[in-house]
Amino acid sequence: MANIKSQKKRVLTNEKAHLRNVAVKSGLKTAIRATREAIAAGDKAAAEAAYKVAAQKLDKAAGAGVIHRNQAANRKSGLAVAINAL
């Protein structure tokens, strides 16, 4: 355990940030999974609706620094290509 007061504060802050990041990543996975399931089902309308939600979550996660902005762009691009192939 840390002995310095500021280190103790950082441990708590880092834990809160970690929990927040895990929650954001979990939401991302859920949104992307919903989009991929709609694509697999061949339902273009549902896939586009799910993509809109997933793209918004990816952009927010990238803006918050949870994922890199290039990773968000690559994931959005991959989903868009799959939807356009329907």
UniProtKB/Swiss-Prot annotation:
Classification via InterPro entries: Ribosomal_bS20, Ribosomal_bS20_sf
UniProt keyword annotation of Chaperone present: no
One Pfam family cited in the UniProt record for this chain: Ribosomal_S20p
Any one Gene Ontology BP term: translation
GO molecular function: small ribosomal subunit rRNA binding; structural constituent of ribosome
Gene Ontology CC, one term: small ribosomal subunit
Keywords on record: Ribonucleoprotein, Ribosomal protein, RNA-binding, rRNA-binding
Superkingdom per UniProt: Bacteria
Xref: HAMAP family: Ribosomal_bS20 (MF_00500)
Family membership: Belongs to the bacterial ribosomal protein bS20 family.
NCBIfam families in the record: S20
Role according to the record: Binds directly to 16S ribosomal RNA.
Protein name: Small ribosomal subunit protein bS20
Species of the source: Bifidobacterium longum subsp. infantis (strain ATCC 15697 / DSM 20088 / JCM 1222 / NCTC 11817 / S12)
Taxonomy of the source species: Bacteria, Bacillati, Actinomycetota, Actinomycetes, Bifidobacteriales
Encoding gene (name): rpsT
